[in-house]
C-alpha cells in the first residue's frame, strides 16, 4: 500500500507567504524560505509554492525564493502560478523546483501539458484545478485566475483530458471548502479518483488532523494539502501524521 503524504502549501505574493479564505482577504503569514525550512524539519513530505503575485517584480522575487529554498530543502518542491510556457517551466526547474503546477495556462493551451510532459517527463507535471460547484447547473466547473473566473469546462471532463495529455498528478482545490476548515470535499474527490489513474493531492477544507484521517479513509487520494491550520499552528504535520497512524493509514 502506498504511504500517504501531508503537504504544506505556501501561497506567495511579492515574496511573502499569505493566506485567505476562499481566495479572498489575504493576510501576511511570513517569510517563505523560513517557513519552507520549518516544514522541512517538521516532517512534511513535500512543499507546494503557489505564486499569486500580480506584477513582474513579484514573479522575479519568486525565482529568488525558490532558489534560496531549494539550496536547503530535502523534500520535493512543487511550484505553480504565473507559468505561461515551456520557457517559464525551464526557468523554474533550473532554479530548484522539482515539479511544476499548471492551472489557467493549461486550460487556455491544453497542448502545453503534452509539450511539457514530453520535454520534462510527466512526473514533473502537476495540473492544479480550482473546482467550483455551480448550484444552478448542479455540477463542478474549472475556474481560472485564482478562482475569480468561472469557465464552462466540467471538472470531471478536464481531469480525464489532462491525464491523456500527460499530466502526472492532480492538485484539486474545492473552492467552496477552501479556508473553511470544515473538512475536505470527500464525495467530489472520490468521484475524481474513480475517473483517473494518476495521483491526486486534495486541497481545501482541512481544519484538523481528523479531517486528514477521514480524507484517506474515504478516498484513495495520495496526499492532503494544508495551509492555514499549519501556518497558524492550530496543528502540526507531526500531529496530523500521528492521527493518521491511529486511523490505520500508512504515512512516510
Swiss-Prot record:
GO terms for molecular function: imidazoleglycerol-phosphate synthase activity; lyase activity. GO terms for cellular component: cytoplasm. The active site is at 11, 130. Belongs to the HisA/HisF family. NCBIfam families: hisF. IGPS catalyzes the conversion of PRFAR and glutamine to IGP, AICAR and glutamate. The HisF subunit catalyzes the cyclization activity that produces IGP and AICAR from PRFAR using the ammonia provided by the HisH subunit. This is Imidazole glycerol phosphate synthase subunit HisF. It comes from Staphylococcus epidermidis (strain ATCC 12228 / FDA PCI 1200). The gene is hisF.
